Amino acid sequence: MLFERPQDGSSTAIIVHSNYSLFSQDQSEFKELVSSAGFFPVLELRNNRKYPEPKFFLGKGKVDEIKACLKQTKADLVVLEDSLSPSQERNLEQFLKRKIIDRKGLILDIFAKRARTHEGKLQVE
């Protein structure tokens, strides 16, 4: 299941921080990055696993918790602080029925939205 790229300011997001991320030191910076992409954070969760799981990157319990939070908050997407493999992203999207964006995808979305020249837009593609 593939989802369209969300529009500016119209999407609410659940942010998942991670203890083993290279970037986990500054959660507020990542939250600002999410806001810069035009998403409104409605909830922040922390993943405390020491190692990523091959299927979902997150543990099954955390994925179930996110699913319950999505139902409760009606958030449009989930943003993970870490980088996912394509199969992990696909597995999460299929299980959660929501768009999943990792750190790399978030940064590319920001660049894509702010690219002004034709060359800049091509580089983001």
Question: Where would I find each of the regions flagged by the language model?
Answer:
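N-terminal accessory targeting/assembly segments
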Residues: 1-112
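Extended, highly charged alpha-helical segments
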Residues: 106-125
